[in-house]
Structures are given as structure tokens and as C-alpha cells.
Amino acid sequence: MPKEDCKYWDKCYQQNPAHLSKYNHPKKQQEHEVDGAEGKKVAPKRSASSQSGEQKKEEQTEPVNKDKSNTSASSTEMVNKDTAKGSYEAETEELHKEAMSNISGKNYMEILEKRIRLSVQKEYDNLCESNEFIRHKFLVEMPPDFYEFWKFVGSLKIDPAKPKDAGLEHLDKVFQLQLVGPFEFLAGKFHGAKLGEPGDYLRHWRFYYDPPEFQTIFVRRGTGIHYGYWRDVPQDKENLLIARNDSAKGCQFQFVAGNAFDAFLYYLEHDFAATPFSCGQLAGTKKAVAKYLSDNSLELAQLDRLQRERNKRVVAKTFHRAGIVVPFDQKTEVGYRPLAVSDSELKKMLAMLERKDVDNGAAKQAVLEKLQPVANAANIAVDESDFGSALELGIDMFCSGHKELHMLASSLLVPAYSMLSRPQFIAIAKAHMEQRSREDNLSIFDVLK
């Protein structure tokens, strides 16, 4: 009986007699046969006609050339990238070394702070190029009559050497009248000036009793007499009343004009003491005002009309007598309620702080204890949408002039102005109470020397 072929062929590892007697272990011939068959299949392709072969050769050569071209371009690109990368790395390394050499031996934070200052200075310089400076630094915008009055001042005195501030110097020299605040910006005094903190600009020419609603524009040199625009809402920039105060005499304000021109004439009539030498210039200046208004056909808002309209909206006079204006619903009586005590009772409480026979600490404690229920009632009023009550008491605390009450005043003014959507007044009030001064010279330029 013939033996079967082992499935492992000559690769079988079994050597036992039983397996060898049963199976043959020949070499695997099929592999060679398959190889031969494959060789026969390939051979006809290699023996094709010469024309076909040349065509195929051309077809095969073209992709090869393209591949070579692509390979060459790719290689060039890689070389360029490597070169650029090397150049970039070298440049980066060079810059790094330069930066490290500059920083070496120096305080890194000082360098960083210097860069920040340069950035802030650049922003400030850009801001000085437009009237946006006024809104940004003083948090308010000026009415049209303000800019018209500035043009008039420029016509009073023309000096090519000082085109912007010749008029200001003329009014100061002849009438002892300083045009300050936003007028100084128009005169170019803030350009190139030393930078201050935000609060410094809000305190610029802000006298001791000036509430946030008031902004100084005129000052009688060397005195506490000053005039300014009154805004019940920070965004107000049309038909603003102008008020007057003498900080040496107290906190009361008086509305004197409905525009800057009339305020100037009021000053010339009431706060300027003319001499025989200045009478001629006084008369000439008054005529110049009338001529300018006539030539430019300016119709300016008048005091009587503006004050009459405002009085309808005043809910409480307060200590400064100018009154406060808040939204008030006549039907529901929501928006304001009277304080828990009258003005006279409130003044009696505060009078204890002025007594010299009572220890200041004890007086302060006693006054605060009496004021606390009044303040609590005002805060409850705020919770019930009567925001005017907290505003009234806060203004009264501020106008009392006692710095011991600043914290109480702030605790009333902040929520009141916040609920009335007057955040600019919060910033102004806080900045003022931080450094409140009885000085007459309150210019930022002297503060930053």
C-alpha cells in the first residue's frame, strides 16, 4: 500500500518510526510550478511589439519626469523652508539675547510698568485730539452754548503767538476771571500735561461744597466764588442752568443764568469790582457780547424759563437750596418720600459736631446714633422705589461739610445714584470725598507738580 504524502512535506519535524512508515516527505513541488506559471504569464507582456513597447516607455517616462520635477520642487521648497526656519530661529535667538541683555541687572516689573505707562500716555495723547477728552475725564458732555462762548472768548483777544489761550489770559488779567475745567482743555492746557489718576480729573476745580451735579467753569481768581453748569442727570447737555456758589460762605447755590454768556454778564455785574481804569474795558466787553450774539443770530435759553421748568420736577430743596430732581409719579407718589425728620431737626443734630465743649469722638458717636434711624428709613425708602429720599439725606450729609459723615453720605448716595442710573455721580462723589479740600486753588496742574 503506497504511503501518503505528509501535509508538512519535507518540513515535518516528526521523526518517530510510525509516522515515517505511514507518510512520505517529498519536497514541495507546487511552489515551483506556481512560480513557473507566473513567469509564463509575465513573459508575454515582456515580448510585446516594439511600437507598443516604445509607447509604453514614453508613457512610463513622462510620469517619471514629472515625479522628478515634483521631487525637485519639493526639495527646493523644503530647503527654502529649512532656510527660513533657520533664519527665524536665528532672529528669535538674537532678539531673545537682546531682551535678556536689556533685562539683565534690572527689575523686570519696572520695565513692564514703563511699557504700561507708555501705552497709557499714547492713549491719553490720542484722547487729547478730540472733545471726547471731556466726556472721558470729567464724565459729562458740554452744551452748545459752552462752545459758542469759547468762540466769543477767542474773538476778544487775538494773539498769533498764543492762538488758543490768549482770550483766557485776557479775561484773567482784566476781569480776574479764570475760565477753568473744560475751557482749559480747549485752550490746550491738558496737552502734554503730566498724567493724573481718574480722581484727579474729577476733583479739578471742584470746591468744597460742590455736589456731583455741579461742574465749575468760571472762578474769580483767588476766591471761593465760582460758577458752573448744573446737571440733574449726567447725560444732560442741553439747556443747562448755571449756578453760583461762594465756598467761603457755605453750601448754598444760586441759579444765575441759562447760558454761559448770561453767566459772564452776571459775573461782570455782581462779582467784578471795576476801577476807573477798567470801566472802559467793562463797557466795551458788554457791547462785544451783544454784538457777537446778534452777528451770529444766537437764541440762547433764558434763566426764567429753564428754572420754571425745573422747579416743577424738584422734589426736595436740600441744604444747598438748589434742590434735587428724581422721577416722581404724582398718582402713585412713588419716587420720593419726605425724610423722617425736618431740615431744622436735622441741622440741630448736626450742630453737636460743631460744639467745642463736647469731645469730638463722643459728639460724632452721639450724632451717628441719632442719624441712624433717619438713614435706615431712607434706605427702606430705596427698597420701596423712593430713591429721592436717600439722595436728599446723602446730599444733606455732604453739604453739612463734616468729613466725619462722609461714610454715611456715601452709603446713601451710592445706592440712590445707582438706582437712578447715575453712576457718573457715584464716581464724582467718591473722588471728591476722598480728597475734599477747602483750598481756593483746586487746579489739577498744581496737584500734579
From Swiss-Prot:
InterPro entries: APLF_PBZ, HPF1. It comes from the Eukaryota. Coiled coil: none annotated. Pfam families: HPF1, zf-CCHH. Keywords: Chromosome, DNA damage, DNA repair, Metal-binding, Nucleus, Phosphoprotein, Zinc, Zinc-finger. The modification Phosphoserine is found at residue 72. Residues 18-93 are annotated as: Disordered. Belongs to the HPF1 family. Cofactor for serine ADP-ribosylation that confers serine specificity on Parp. Switches the amino acid specificity of Parp from aspartate or glutamate to serine residues. Acts by completing the active site of Parp: forms a composite active site composed of residues from HPF1/CG1218 and Parp. This is Histone PARylation factor 1-like.
